[in-house]
Structures are given as C-alpha cells and as structure tokens.
C-alpha cells in the first residue's frame, strides 16, 4: 500500500493520507521540497534548527519540519523521512502529515513538501 501527496505549509489541519496505521505495521516515509514559516527563506522537511520553539505543535522537531499524527497520537517528527519505522503498540489510525509551526500562525506560510509513504505488514 502506498500514498503520494503534497503537504502544504499553510494547512494548519495537515494532510490526511489514505494510510491507516495498525500496531506492528512497518512504514517508510520520504519527504522533499521547500517551505517557509513566514517572510523568511525556505527550508526543507528537516526545518530550521536556528528558530526557537515558541509553542510549536511538535516540540521534538524544528520549526518548519514535517511531522505526523497517527490517529489521536501526539505529533511525531518525520523530517526528511523514516525508514522501516514501527510506532509504539498503542498507536493506531490514519496518518496525518503536518507542517510544524505555532498554532494560529499558518496563514503566512508558503511552499510544500512532496511525500511518499509505503506500508508493509510486519
């Protein structure tokens, strides 16, 4: 099973994918592209390591990084990708990809990340 799509930096709700993660599933995610969290230079999916955390949705990733939620989980850093990754056993649901920024400040963001997700059963 696979999913391919765009994650817009100005979409605060994130991009829901067609991938449903079940405990034990093995996924690989690859991300590329350029996006900006305001009138600044653009960054890749790893985000801007120099920007301070001023209330980001994911405190474990840099501002402008690609992160995800699985079902009702907390945010999980993705950055440029994850290879053959397995989530904790209590995580289950649809994968939503999100640009890491401060809630309520997405309106001045621009750009996007192209993302591919592959899923294998463990």
UniProtKB/Swiss-Prot annotation:
Cytoplasm is among the record's keywords: yes
Keyword Cytoplasm in annotation: yes
UniProt source species: Pseudomonas aeruginosa (strain ATCC 15692 / DSM 22644 / CIP 104116 / JCM 14847 / LMG 12228 / 1C / PRS 101 / PAO1)
Top-level taxonomic group: Bacteria
Pfam families with a match to the protein in the record: PA-IL (PF07828)
Alphabetized Gene3D superfamilies for the sequence: Galactose-binding lectin (2.60.120.430)
InterPro entries: Galactose-bd-like_sf (IPR008979), PA-IL (IPR012905)
Protein name according to UniProt: PA-I galactophilic lectin
UniProt KW keywords: Cytoplasm, Lectin, Periplasm
GO cellular component: cell surface; cytoplasm; periplasmic space
Single GO BP term: heterophilic cell-cell adhesion via plasma membrane cell adhesion molecules
Family: Belongs to the LecA/PllA lectin family.
Main function: D-galactose specific lectin. Binds in decreasing order of affinity: melibiose, methyl-alpha-D-galactoside, D-galactose, methyl-beta-D-galactoside, N-acetyl-D-galactosamine. Similar to plant lectins in its selective (carbohydrate-specific) hemagglutinating activity.
Localisation per UniProt entry: Cytoplasm; Periplasm; Cell surface
GO molecular function, one term: carbohydrate binding
